[in-house]
A protein has these predicted regions:
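C-terminal structural segments of small proteins and small subunits
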Residues: 66-86
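Conserved short "hinge" loops at termini or chain/domain junctions
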Residues: 1-54, 72, 86-95
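Short, hydrophobic/amphipathic alpha-helical patches that form generic packing surfaces
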Residues: 56-68
Length: 95
C-alpha cells in the first residue's frame, strides 16, 4: 500500500475501534504494516485496497494487535482465515 492508503486505513481504524486521538498515527501504521505482512504470508498477493474481505481481516487484525492480542486473532479467526485463503480460484498448474 502507498502512504495515502495507510492514512485512509488509519482513519478507518480510529473510527471503527474508537482509538483515542492522542494515539500517534505511527503506532497505528506500524501495526498495519506488521499485520499486513503476516496476512500476506498467509495469502500472498492480497489486495487490501480493493478486496473488502481482506481489508476487513486486516482491520480486525490491527485491532487485536493494538490490544496486544496478536496470536489470539489467529486463533479466533482461524476458520475465517482458511476460508479466505481458499476463496480464490487457483489456476491449473498443468496448463
Amino acid at each position: 500500500m502507498i502512504n495515502e492508503q495507510y492514512d485512509i486505513l488509519t482513519e478507518e481504524i480510529r473510527a471503527d475501534n474508537q482509538v483515542p486521538p492522542y494515539t500517534p498515527d505511527d503506532v497505528i501504521i506500524d501495526s498495519i504494516t506488521k499485520c499486513e505482512r503476516r496476512l500476506n504470508m498467509l495469502k500472498p498477493g492480497t489486495d487490501f485496497v480493493t478486496d473488502p474481505l481482506s481489508r476487513g481481516l486486516l482491520k480486525d487484525f490491527v485491532y487485536y494487535d493494538m490490544v496486544h492480542r496478536f496470536e489470539e486473532f489467529l486463533a479466533n479467526y482461524g476458520p475465517d482465515i482458511r476460508a479466505w485463503q481458499l476463496s480464490e480460484e487457483v489456476a491449473d498448474a498443468s496448463e
